[in-house]
Amino acid sequence: GLGDVYKRQAGKKVFIINCHGCKEVRFPEKEAVELQKELSAEGNVTGIMTTDYICNPENMQLRLQKHMDKIREADLVLVFSCGVGVQTIAEYLEDKMVCAACDTYPVPGFQGVTPLEYKCDQCGECYLNLTGGICPITACSKSLVNGQCGGSKNGKCEVDSEMECGWERIYRRLKEIGRLDALKCPTQIHNFATDDELK
C-alpha cells in the first residue's frame, strides 16, 4: 500500500505534493487522503500542495516557490503523481529526498506535458524511492535495477557512448542527499511478464 513508502522514513517531517493534472492518470485520491490525514495527525506534515501538471517545470517551480519555507522544514518530499512528476520534483529539489507515493501503470501513448527528457516506463514497480528520483529502468540502457553493470567508461554507457551512465547519476544523486544507504536495500527484480502471462 501507499503507507509502505513512508515506513522507512517513520517519524521524519514530510512535505506532500499532489498532482491532479492528467485526466488520463487515475489519482489514488481516497488512499492519498487517508495517508495524509494519518501523517498530519502524527504532526509529521510540514505542508501540503495540490496542483496540476507538476511535470511542467515552469508551473511546478512557481508553485513550489510559494511553499519553500515548509519544504525546507521537511526531511523528505512525498509526491502523489506519475513517475515523470516525481523526477521533475527531484531534479528541482536537489537537496531533498523525494519519494514516489504511488506506482505508475501504463497509459498507452501518454507521458504528461513536460518538454524535458524525464522518462517513466510506467512499469507499476516504481524504484524512484531507492534511486534518488532517477529511474533506473529508463536512465540505464540495460534497465538494470540492482546497480551498475561495470561496463561504463568515463561515466558513459558501454551500449551508447553518448549516454551518461544511469547508475553513476543515481550514485551521485544519493551521495548529494546523504542517502547512499539506499543502495544497500534489497531490490525486487523487475517483473517483465505481460498481462496475458499473469492471467
What are these regions (language model features)?
Residues N44, D95-K96:
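A short helix->loop->beta-strand "cap" motif at the edges of active sites that frequently abuts
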Residues G11-K12:
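Nucleotide donor/acceptor-binding cores
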Residues E94-D95, Y127:
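Activity-critical C-terminal alpha-helical subdomain
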Residues T104-G109:
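Short gly/pro/ser/thr-enriched loop/turn and capping motifs at secondary-structure boundaries
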Residues K96-D103:
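Short hydrophobic/aromatic-enriched beta-strand-loop microsegments
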Residues F110-K199:
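Cysteine-cluster motifs in flexible loop/terminal segments that predominantly coordinate metals
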